[in-house]
């Protein structure tokens, strides 16, 4: 889930990348309007909706959103990076925004490796060989998986809440009671009542998750509504239910992803240069940094921000965190 941390993530991503160009900044382009001009491209099973801003020759940066958010999480940070010479790609994940499945016959599958392969397919479609990755929540997990399975495609990584790769076997194991409570929605989605409830109350549900994950963030209706529209995607509910049910071992994935999931079940190390970040007031379920530090075996740093930093704070903090 997105936050002040995610702004920090992008700033730190820059520090892992190449030296920034001032070309775009000097040109004085207004990249902010790009979020009103979403592009579409066929990539694998999907017709992907994505924002693509900044000079085409710039270092590619891929920013991945989480649930239940969307590309507008990066509506201010992406233009800031583009103005510094980066080519910034912000795709809508499957089940969000204008991204659509090309075939009606394709399962509305939300398993983690499928989402990671979507991003690799998008890179291929855009002829991007390697990119800097940053993400939070589903986006961080997706970026982690790309880094683990296709390290040659990842120049560097910034992951909010660190190492989020898991497996169905792990997901089946009970957690301490306090941890189980944080995952209440996952268990809700496992029931017919939860499926019906999320479909009926998607926006209200998302607003509740935003508030629980980010207790100090007083987001406006305008900010929420900009992202909530993406949840009206016709496949959003199915993909969401699939994702959380798959994690608990209640649904099988597609066979074409079996080899990826088998490798991920070994909890592979991530070897690319990485910075993980966390905040002191993150209301979303998240692992302790010490628990995953050893999974990053390349150049690695962890940054913990202050007690007032929660899991979703306004874009007003951008100026302090993008360098």
Description of each model-found segment:
Residues 1-9:
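Bacterial N-terminal signal peptides that target proteins for export
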Residues 9-17:
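Bacterial N-terminal signal peptides
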Residues 19-21:
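N-terminal signal peptide c-region/cleavage motif recognized by signal peptidases
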Residues 25-37, 45-48, 53, 60, ...:
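Flexible "cap/lid" subdomain of the alpha/beta-hydrolase fold that forms the substrate-access gate
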Residues 42-44, 65:
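Short strand-coil-strand connectors
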Residues 52-101, 292:
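Conserved HGGG/HGGXW glycine-rich cap/lid loop of the alpha/beta-hydrolase fold
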Residues 299-323:
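Catalytic active-site module of serine/aspartate enzymes centered on a nucleophile-bearing elbow/loop
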């Amino acid at each position: 889930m997105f936050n002040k941390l995610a702004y920090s993530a992008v700033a730190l991503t820059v520090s892992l990348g190449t030296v920034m160009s001032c070309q775009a900044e000097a040109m004085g382009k207004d990249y902010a309007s790009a979020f009103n001009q979403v592009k579409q491209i066929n990539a694998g099973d999907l017709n992907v909706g994505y924002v693509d801003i900044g000079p085409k020759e710039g270092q590619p940066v891929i920013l991945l959103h989480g649930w239940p958010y969307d590309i507008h999480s990066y509506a201010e940070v992406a233009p800031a990076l583009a103005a510094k010479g980066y080519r910034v790609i912000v795709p809508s994940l499957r089940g969000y925004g204008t991204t659509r499945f090309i075939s009606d016959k394709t399962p509305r599958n939300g398993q983690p490796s499928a989402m990671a392969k979507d991003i690799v397919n998008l890179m291929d479609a855009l002829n991007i060989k390697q990119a800097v990755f940053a993400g939070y929540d589903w986006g961080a997990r997706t970026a982690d998986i790309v880094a683990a399975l296709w390290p040659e495609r990842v120049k560097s990584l910034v992951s909010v809440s660190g190492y989020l790769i898991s497996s169905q076997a792990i997901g089946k194991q009970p957690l301490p009671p306090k941890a189980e409570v944080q995952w209440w929605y996952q268990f809700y989605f496992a029931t017919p009542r939860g499926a019906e409830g999320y479909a009926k109350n998607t926006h209200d549900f998302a607003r509740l998750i935003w508030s629980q994950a980010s207790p100090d963030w007083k987001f406006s209706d305008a900010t929420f509504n900009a992202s909530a529209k993406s949840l009206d995607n016709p496949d959003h509910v199915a993909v969401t239910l699939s994702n959380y049910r798959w994690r608990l071992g209640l649904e099988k994935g597609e066979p074409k992803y079996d080899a990826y999931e088998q490798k991920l079940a070994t909890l592979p190390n991530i070897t690319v240069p990485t910075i993980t970040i966390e905040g002191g007031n993150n209301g979303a379920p998240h692992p302790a940094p010490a628990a995953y530090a050893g999974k990053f075996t390349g150049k690695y740093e962890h940054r913990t921000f202050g007690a007032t930093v929660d899991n979703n704070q306004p874009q007003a903090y951008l100026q302090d965190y993008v360098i």
